[in-house]
Amino acid sequence: MENQRIRISKAMLKSGLLKLLKEKPLNQISVYELCAVSQINRTTFYKYYGSPAELLNEIETDFMAQLDEDLKSMIAQSINALLPVLNHLYEHRELFCLLIRSMPEQEFAAHLFSIPSISIIFDNMADESSYSETKTKYIRRFIFQGTLTVLRDWLNSESPEPVAEIADVLTVLRRKLW
């Protein structure tokens, strides 16, 4: 169990890393620079993390865990969970976009679509299909990657389309494939 001082130090480091990621890629961020921006000494940094990449992984893990927790209640309340999921991502789009830009895309996609609440949505889609197991696997992968690309482009845009419009686009694509 972490005490308050540890939580504050980690929060300052996370905030500092996110601030730096807005300016440059992860591989150009040094521990020295991160600690200066975070106002935390390097000894404290190394007490909890081995590298900025390790800190970024923790930020991603926290984001995914929070997303899953928030989505569980949304999915329980709605048969069509797509709109609540998109609303949630829109509300957290700055962090989502930073993570997707800062991590290998395949790794981020694998983590995102392995979240239990998101897996449930896609599993429900697979249950509706009449395709063989092999076809379902490839169609599902295609939908995952296409959905991620749509989300990335949508959330990175200067003036994103309304959530309902993106939900409609994804629903139309899903119906065409499934």
Language model features with spans:
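Cytosolic nucleotide-binding catalytic cores of signal-transduction proteins
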Residues: 23-24, 130-131, 175
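An amphipathic alpha-helix adjacent to DNA-recognition modules
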Residues: 10-18, 27-28, 36-39, 46-75, ...
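N-terminal intrinsically disordered/low-complexity leader segments
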Residues: 1-6
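Residues within the helices of the helix-turn-helix
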Residues: 32
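Flexible coil/turn residues that form the inter-helical turn or adjacent wing/linker of helix-turn-helix
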Residues: 24-27, 159
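Amphipathic alpha-helical packing segments from all-alpha helical-bundle domains
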Residues: 105-149
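Helical hydrophobic small-molecule/effector-binding pocket
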Residues: 76-122
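C-terminal peripheral helix-coil segments that are non-catalytic and often amphipathic
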Residues: 145, 153-178
